[in-house]
């Protein structure tokens, strides 16, 4: 239980988070803030980090390693058998053996997390501490749970999976900062997530990216007349989105070129908002007749105004524009990699094709984020798109016993 002092402090944080509106497309709407305000936010964020030191140390970033990896690599048919022999003979330690397993990283926003809107206290706690239990990284062996991408990959190979995603994460300029609310819940924007990966000695073999949904709040900062004619605004947002996405992606590619193992990067298009709004409208009707159903449905409208019915059409329109920018961006980057044999970048619309029109796929609390069934559908769709990248990396059902250096990390011994 919390001490009285900690409880009072956190209660104040919850009230602040509830009172202060969320800022989505910050670089378009936010004026420069006074220095004392910036310093106050910095101090408050550091205080929360100090209070939650146990959480920050224990789960930053959340990682899962195949539990029986040692038994699996000890099989002569394993591609990592030679690494296992080196470990048994004392040439490398256990940590180095784990580093030689395939590493997979996930970058994204709240749609890659077990996240939904609830009471401020519950939302804060879950955003800061709740990891796993999502379509990318779920380790629950219960057949009724999510069969995550991590678990599906385990059928082929032992691996290490790490999630860098965070609720509220944006595709924003690296110079924009993460903002106070995002720092409080320990969220990093795309550039910050990329920076985390770039700091690691062991660079991932496979990087999956699904982010941009928080960039869709196109009404933020616009007057009523401007909302009537948003064409210029939407195009500005799409153009800036591509610039801000390209910078961290290029940094990851540049690092990948220096690695002595193959690297595949998969950029996923945004969710199918057209089908999502069909389900949300059903939820709105049910909530109107019985407010206990989808109890936090209105919270989404308050913090993300573009979810409101008058603005949904242009939100869908913007999502398609951003998907087009990502597709074009990846195509250009792929052409630049023509002479690089160890880096592959791919755009996938697999997650954009998930049909969210069914009520059971959206969360029963806020009718905004995916439900458990929604996470199951996303896991199946995402995994179905990984075939070309897994083949490029040499990960698959028909792995042979011969060593595969493209999968092994050969650091200094």
Annotate each predicted stretch with a short phrase:
Residues 107-121, 269-293:
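Short, solvent-exposed beta-strand-terminating loops
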Residues 103-115, 161-166, 205-210, 215-217, ...:
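Structural recognition of the beta-strand scaffold that forms the well-ordered cores
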Residues 122-250:
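Conserved SGNH/GDSL esterase-like catalytic core that processes O-acyl groups on lipids
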Residues 320-328, 332, 343-395:
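Extracellular low-complexity, Gly/Ser/Thr-rich intrinsically disordered linkers
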Residues 276-346, 372:
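Substrate-gating cap/lid alpha-helix
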Residues 2-3, 10-13, 17-160, 203, ...:
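N-terminal secretory targeting modules
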Residues 256-263:
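A short helix->loop->beta-strand "cap" motif at the edges of active sites that frequently abuts
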Residues 115-120, 176, 218-223, 277-281, ...:
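Short, solvent-exposed loop/turn and secondary-structure capping segments
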């Amino acid at each position: 239980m919390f001490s009285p002092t900690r409880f009072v402090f956190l209660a104040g944080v919850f009230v602040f988070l509830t009172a202060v509106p969320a800022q989505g497309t910050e670089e378009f709407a936010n004026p420069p803030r006074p220095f004392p305000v910036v310093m106050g936010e910095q101090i408050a964020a550091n205080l929360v980090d100090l209070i939650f030191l146990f959480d920050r140390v224990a789960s930053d970033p959340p990682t899962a390693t195949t539990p029986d990896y040692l038994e699996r690599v000890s099989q002569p048919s394993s591609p990592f058998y030679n690494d296992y022999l080196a470990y048994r003979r004392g040439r490398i330690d256990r940590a180095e053996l784990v580093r030689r397993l395939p590493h997979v990283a996930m970058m994204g926003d709240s749609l890659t997390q077990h996240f939904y809107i609830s009471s401020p206290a519950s939302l804060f706690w879950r955003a800061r501490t709740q990891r796993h239990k999502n379509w990318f990284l779920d380790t629950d062996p219960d057949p009724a749970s999510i069969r995550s991408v991590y678990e599906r990959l385990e059928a082929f190979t032992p691996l290490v999976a790490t999630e860098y995603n965070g609720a509220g994460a944006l595709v924003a300029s690296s110079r924009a900062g993460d903002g106070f609310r995002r720092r409080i819940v320990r969220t990093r924007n795309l550039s910050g997530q990329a920076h985390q990966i770039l700091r690691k000695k062991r660079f991932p073999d496979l990087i999956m990216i699904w982010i941009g949904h928080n960039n869709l709040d196109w009404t933020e900062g616009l007057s009523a007349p401007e909302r009537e004619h948003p064409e210029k605004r939407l195009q500005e947002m799409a153009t800036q989105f591509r610039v801000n996405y390209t910078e961290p992606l290029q940094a990851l590619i540049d690092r990948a070129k220096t690695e002595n193992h193959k690297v595949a990067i998969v950029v996923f298009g945004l969710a199918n908002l057209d089908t999502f709004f069909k389900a949300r409208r059903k939820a709105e009707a049910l909530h109107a007749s019985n407010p206990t159903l989808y109890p936090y449905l209105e919270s989404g409208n308050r913090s993300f105004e573009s979810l409101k019915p008058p603005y949904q059409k242009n939100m869908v329109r913007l999502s398609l524009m951003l998907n087009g920018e990502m597709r074009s961006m990846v195509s250009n980057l792929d052409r630049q990699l023509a002479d690089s044999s160890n880096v592959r970048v791919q755009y996938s619309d697999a997650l954009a094709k998930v049909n969210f029109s069914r009520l059971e796929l959206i969360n029963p609390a806020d009718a905004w984020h995916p439900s458990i069934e929604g996470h199951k559908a996303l896991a199946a769709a995402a995994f179905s798109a990984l075939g070309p990248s897994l083949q490029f990396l040499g990960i698959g059902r028909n792995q042979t016993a011969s060593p595969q250096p493209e999968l092994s990390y050969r650091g200094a011994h």
